Amino acid sequence: MSVKSTRARRVSSDTELTESFEHNWMFDFKIKRPFYFNPKHREFYDCIKHSKTKMGFVDGPAGSMKTYIAVYAGLELIKQEKFQRLVYIRSVTESAERSLGSLPGEVDDKFSPYAIPLQEKITEITNGGTYTMLKQKGVVEAIPVNFVRGLTFNKALVIVDEAQNLSRKELTTILTRFGRDSRYIVLGD
C-alpha cells in the first residue's frame, strides 16, 4: 500500500488525530484500468463522473457492463473524495421460478447473496480484500430495498441495481432518500 500524502496541519486532540489517520487510509486502494470502454460505455462513465449529474437512469441488456461501470466510476469518485461512501441497493427478487425460501441468519447474512454482484465488481476492479476492508470501514454498503425507508444518503453515490425488479412504490421510496451532495445511478434491463 502506498501512503497518501497530506498537508501538515495542527491537530488539537487524540481523537482528531485518529480520525485524520483513519480518513487517509480509508481511501487507499488501487483501481485497475478498465479493459475496454466502447463509446456507449464511455458516455455512461462520463455521465456518472460529471459533477452536475445528480441522477442517471441507464437501461441495457444483461451483461452490458452497467454495474461494472457504475462501480468503477463510484470507486474513482470515492478515491477522489467526491463521496464518502458507495451505497448499493437491490431488490431481493429471485430470478428463478422457484424460491429458495427463507435464509438463516442476520440481515447481512440473508442479503449477502444479493450483494455478490457488487463484491465481484469491486474485487475485479481492485485488489483482493478491498471489498471486505471498504465494507468494514462503512465506505461500501449493500442494502436491501426493504430497509431503505427512513434513511437519508448524504455524500453518497447510490447505485440502484436491477431496477426492473422494483415496484413503482419501491423505486419512489429509494428516490426520496436523496440527501445532501449525493448522486443516484439507477440501472435496469
Language-model features: locations:
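Conserved P-loop
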Residues: 56-137
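Interdomain "pre-motor" coupling segment immediately N-terminal to P-loop NTPase/helicase cores
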Residues: 1-23
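Conserved adenine-nucleotide phosphate-binding loops and their immediately adjacent elements
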Residues: 22-33
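Pre-Walker A (Motif I) flank of P-loop NTPase domains
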Residues: 51-56, 155
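Structural recognition of the conserved hydrophobic beta-strand(s) that form the central parallel beta-sheet
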Residues: 159-161, 183-189
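N-terminal pre-P-loop "Q-motif" helix
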Residues: 33-52
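Conserved catalytic/switch belt of AAA+ P-loop NTPases
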Residues: 119-127, 172-185
